[in-house]
Amino acid sequence: MLIEVSYFEGGYIRKISGYIHKVDTNEQYLHLYEETGLFKIRLSEITEIKCLT
């Protein structure tokens, strides 16, 4: 399932699209596969998640 994640970084809202690899509840990260590889986002920085497919 392809998703778009909006997240807060450096005072701006950024967006990234990809596929969920895993949610690490111990470290509080979302691991996301995107075009250039694996991307990690802190759960506390996520502002919105949309399903694209």
Question: Residues of each region from the PLM?
Answer:
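Conserved RNA-binding domains used in RNP assembly and mRNA/RNA metabolism
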Residues: 1-53
